Swiss-Prot record:
Residues engaged in binding ATP 2: G324, P325, N326, G327, S328, G329, K330, T331
Effect caused by changing F237V: Still confers resistance to virginiamycin M, lincomycin and tiamycin
Keyword GTP-binding listed: no
Entry comment, domain topic: The antibiotic resistance domain (ARD) is packed between the 23S rRNA and the acceptor arm of the P-site tRNA and inserts into the peptidyltransferase center (PTC). The C-terminal extension (CTE) contacts the small ribosomal subunit, positioned in the Shine-Dalgarno-anti-Shine-Dalgarno cavity.
Residue stretches making up the ABC transporter domain: 5-200, 292-504
Chain coiled-coil ranges: 193-222, 245-269, 488-543
Keywords: Antibiotic resistance, ATP-binding, Coiled coil, Cytoplasm, Nucleotide-binding, Repeat, RNA-binding, rRNA-binding, tRNA-binding
UniProt-recorded name of the protein: Ribosome protection protein VmlR
Domain of life: Bacteria
Disruption phenotype annotation: Hypersensitivity toward the antibiotics virginiamycin M and lincomycin, mildly increased sensitivity to erythromycin, clindamycin and oleandomycin. Hypersensitivity toward the antibiotics virginiamycin M, lincomycin and tiamulin, in this study has no effect on sensitivity to erythromycin, chloramphenicol or linezolid.
Family matches, as SMART domains: AAA
Residue numbers binding ATP 1: G37, K38, N39, G40, A41, G42, K43, S44
InterPro entries in alphabetical order: AAA+_ATPase, ABC_tran_Xtn, ABC_transporter-like_ATP-bd, ABCF_EF3_subfamily, P-loop_NTPase, VmlR
Length: 547
């Protein structure tokens, strides 16, 4: 395949802090590359380097004569002016209303920007977190658009399902360098786990060898010491013991050289501990039974009705998912509950409720301030508690005095979450809380919220997240709001999970086959496995069509 971008020994620094170094990678025509890594690893930075918005500290990036387009994570402004026919068509398919950009929902804003990027007919399309805010239907549409895109795509994402479905190659930013893998996200994670196990075994084997040789050296040193002592004490045998001592010294030097050579040959490093994030949200506030009661609530913007005559009650301790298509009014409903927007009907909120509201916005923080200034504390103990929490959330010590504007989008979301962790809210209202968060942070947030004893209202399109954290849902559809208990996964959903598992296995087999020839040992078995997996996936697709 044709190589369109080459990165050679690329390094990047911010204020003398190394983001990544010695990055070597290539982009082939037709690739769909998923960039993964923890918050602050430099994923968005790498996109901007490829787009030529930034210059590397070292190394070079060679781009063939290609057209590039970049769709960023978030933007404060956008214009519907000068639309191309292709862009108009995508906006219609995605049902994006052509009105003031600031009046659009988070999902509608993203779809408008994606439509512009996809319609530019670029040779290389760069997408930064393209699934944030997207509902299930829009996500599936985007996956199909990318699979049939007549060009190359590099995307940053923390969405496990999306990476499995769309990516043909993974770039993982770990330990300040880049690892390339041919296959999807799940295939890479299996490969990574095997690699870490092999590395750990090699390191342990090397350490045993070092211990063995060092024990022999210590034994020889003891003999040498004894021989030297005897050479000065025993009359008549001094020369014999002196020669013996010298011979032992020579053996020690020989062993030392052998050890050094063995270490040079092996150079196995211990496995870097997994990046982890730890936090917990406590509530100590006593509350009554009801948190919220909504009666006959109707909300419309001009002639456009979002929902009408909505009635539901939420008890303290309930964990409720708010779901619906992009633009259906999920964020508007949250704002009505919080009294930030008006509506017809009655909304009662428990006056004793201590509410924390995490918005979708990442620009509403004081960007010039540092965490030290934002979480200003009078006592040394309180300041230490905040710094300890930051460390558990994956921040470095230097970021305590770093302006928030220099932080990644995911790190900004964590800063907002910190406020609610510190204030011990008994009601959390979260609007797309997993947007921008890296995978370890998402998983830890899921675990924390599943054990949270307070009331939770969450808007999210991350089905894994909602399955783990909520037990009921408010469904906004057909201008109404219906409260439902979380249902048991349907047979169709189980088929979809099986299909995804089979696709992951097929990608893993394909990755191995790509490094082999038909004459290699094991090729025939892998090729047979690939064909069998393909057959099973087609059978599942056929069943879906029948449904």
């Amino acid at each position: 395949m044709k190589e369109i971008v080459t990165l050679t020994n690329v390094s990047y620094e911010v204020k003398d802090q190394t983001v990544f170094k010695h990055v070597n990678a290539s982009v082939q025509q037709g690739d769909i590359i998923g960039i993964i890594g923890k918050n602050g690893a430099g994923k968005s930075t790498l996109l901007h380097l490829i787009h030529n918005d930034l210059a590397p500290a070292q190394g070079q990036i060679l781009r063939k004569d290609i057209k590039l387009a970049l769709v960023e994570q978030e933007t404060a402004a956008y214009s519907f002016a000068d639309q191309t026919p292709a862009e108009k068509k995508l906006l219609e398919k995605w049902h994006v209303p052509l009105r003031d950009f600031h009046q659009l929902s988070g999902g509608e804003k993203l779809k408008a920007r994606l439509a512009k990027g996809l319609s530019e007919d670029a040779d290389l399309l760069l997408l930064d977190e393209p699934t944030n805010h997207l509902d299930e239907k829009s996500l599936q549409f985007l996956i199909q658009q990318l699979k049939h895109y007549n060009g190359t795509v590099i995307l940053v994402s923390h969405d496990r399902y999306f990476l499995d479905e769309a990516a043909t190659k993974i770039w993982s930013l770990e330990d300040q360098t880049l690892i390339e893998f041919k296959g999807n996200y799940s295939g890479y994670m299996k490969f990574r786990e095997k690699k870490r196990l092999t590395q750990q075994r090699e390191y342990e084997k090397q350490q045993k060898m070092v211990e063995r040789i060092e024990a022999q050296m210590n034994g020889l040193a003891s003999w040498s010491e004894k021989a030297h002592a005897q050479s000065t004490k025993k009359e008549g045998f001094k020369e014999y013991h002196r020669v013996k001592a010298k011979r032992t010294d020579a053996q020690i030097k020989s062993k030392q050289k052998r050890l050094e050579k063995e270490l040079e040959k092996a150079k196995a490093e211990p496995v870097t501990p997994e990046y982890t994030v730890r936090f917990s949200i406590d509530t100590t506030h006593k509350t009554g039974k009801r948190f919220l009661e909504v009666q006959n609530v109707t909300k419309a913007f001009g002639e456009r009705t979002l929902f009408k005559n909505a009635n539901f009650t939420i008890q303290h301790g309930e964990k409720v998912a708010i779901i619906g298509p992009n633009g259906s009014g999920k964020t508007t409903l949250l704002n009505i509950i919080l009294g930030q927007e008006t509506a017809e009907g009655s909304v009662w909120v428990s006056p004793s409720a201590n509410i924390g509201y995490l918005t979708q916005e990442v620009f509403d923080l004081p960007l010039e301030q540092t965490p030290e200034e934002l979480f200003e504390n009078e006592t040394f103990k309180a300041r230490g508690h905040v710094q300890n929490l930051m460390r558990h959330l994956g921040f470095t010590a230097a970021q305590w005095t770093e302006p928030i504007k220099h932080m990644s989008m995911g790190e900004r979301v964590k800063i907002k979450l910190m406020a609610y962790i510190l204030e011990e809210k008994d009601v959390l209202i979260l609007d797309e809380p997993t947007n921008h968060l890296d995978l370890p942070s998402r998983e830890q947030l899921e675990e924390t919220l599943s054990q949270y004893s307070g009331t939770l209202l969450a808007v999210s399109h991350d089905r894994y997240f909602l399955e783990k954290t909520t037990n009921s849902k408010l469904v906004i559809s057909n201008n109404g709001i219906e409260k439902q208990l979380n249902d048991v996964p349907s047979e169709r959903n189980e088929r979809e999970e099986l299909r995804l598992k089979l696709e992951t296995e097929r990608q893993e087999v394909l990755g191995k086959l790509s490094f082999m020839t038909p004459n290699d040992k094991g090729y025939k078995e892998l090729d047979q496995a690939f064909n069998e997996l393909t057959k099973r996936i087609k059978e599942l697709d056929h069943q879906d069509k029948k449904d």
